[in-house]
């Protein structure tokens, strides 16, 4: 056999070896990790920024289970020790409750990676983002919006302006469904220090002060049950100011129904990741949580949807929306210039004390 033929056959053999190896690599069954999350643009953003990259980096087949929040499925899984889900995306109030009930694994905060800029995790995450059983993913806020061009050059800028009917007349739209958000906003706009708000609301005097502040709007108050309705009120003139969810401001802008925004005293909450207690894939689940709450992953989500990264270091990595080309930074609660006076809603406090306060709120509401 000639040397040339030997080389050719050797080369063919090498190619076949590579092809066979590739076949077995592609056909092998990857381990599955199932993450329960939400449908719609948020779940789509997580798929693009977290689930696919984690699967590629760690050789996992990430399955997505859609749910509507709450704890019923988690309670059944942990109670029966039959686990359909390995990681869950929670609204923070549910994560707090699940942690208190012993339904979630403890998460070692010291194991979380530093931010992309080197900031240690314990200094990088926003307040309330890291707890005994959860790690924050995104921040969303109730903010103040007002009808554009209504006040000319005298642009409202602060939460106090929401209550200033003399300078900025017109109807005010507030959330009807709960005292939460309304009482905090009233006290902050009345000049109370943020650190004093929840101590004050433990007392009749503090609640009275909040309700008196809200009562200064009597005769100008209208109510909403859905934040999208508040945007509609601003657009059609039923309201001059409204408290709204920041995501609805983004949606309105995409449909050319934009409103003007005041970020002062935004009231923020979080979505977080947690791991069901006793699940068989705890190690992989924890690995996913660390990956998904890294700076790059959180920035990727914020490039798709208007929810602020729960880590400050992620902001510099946020890009324009890949499909729409929209600059996302103006819509993010945690963006520079937006977060300086942000107030963290204390969901654990509301779980403990809300049942005592809500009846008082309903009585006051009926009097308006």
List where the protein language model places each region.
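Extracytoplasmic ligand-binding site segments that recognize negatively charged/polar headgroups
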Residues: 40-47, 84-85, 90-231
């Amino acid at each position: 056999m000639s040397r040339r033929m030997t080389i050719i056959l050797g080369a063919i053999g090498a190619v076949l070896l590579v092809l066979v190896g590739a076949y077995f690599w592609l056909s092998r069954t990857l381990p599955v990790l199932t993450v329960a999350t939400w449908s719609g643009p948020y779940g789509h953003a997580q798929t693009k920024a977290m689930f696919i990259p984690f699967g590629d980096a760690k050789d996992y087949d990430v399955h997505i289970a859609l749910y509507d929040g709450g704890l019923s499925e988690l309670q059944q899984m942990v109670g029966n020790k039959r686990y359909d889900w390995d990681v869950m995306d929670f609204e923070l109030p549910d994560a707090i409750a699940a942690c208190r009930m012993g339904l979630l694994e403890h998460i070692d905060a010291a194991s979380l990676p530093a931010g992309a800029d080197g900031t240690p995790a314990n200094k990088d995450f926003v307040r309330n983002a890291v707890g005994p059983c959860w790690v924050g993913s995104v921040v969303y806020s109730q903010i103040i919006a007002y009808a554009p061009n209504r006040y000319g050059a005298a642009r409202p800028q602060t939460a106090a302006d929401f209550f200033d009917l003399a300078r900025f007349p017109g109807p005010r739209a507030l959330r009807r469904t709960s005292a939460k958000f309304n009482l905090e906003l009233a006290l902050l706009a009345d000049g109370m220090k943020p650190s004093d708000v929840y101590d004050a609301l433990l007392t009749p005097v503090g609640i009275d002060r909040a309700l008196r502040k809200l009562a200064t709007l009597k005769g100008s108050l209208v109510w909403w049950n859905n934040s999208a309705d508040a945007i509609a009120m601003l657009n059609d003139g039923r309201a001059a100011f409204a408290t709204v969810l920041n995501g609805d401001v983004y949606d309105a802008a995409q449909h050319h129904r934009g409103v003007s925004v005041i970020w002062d005293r935004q009231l923020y909450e979080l979505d977080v990741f947690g791991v069901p207690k006793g699940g068989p894939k705890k190690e992989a689940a924890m690995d996913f949580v660390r990956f998904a709450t890294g700076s790059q992953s959180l920035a990727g989500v914020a490039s798709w949807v208007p929810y602020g990264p729960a880590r400050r270091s992620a902001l510099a990595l946020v890009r324009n929306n890949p499909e729409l080309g929209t600059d996302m930074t103006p819509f993010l609660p945690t963006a520079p210039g937006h977060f300086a006076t942000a107030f963290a809603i204390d969901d654990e406090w509301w779980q403990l004390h809300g049942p005592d306060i809500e009846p008082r709120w309903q009585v006051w509401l009926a009097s308006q």
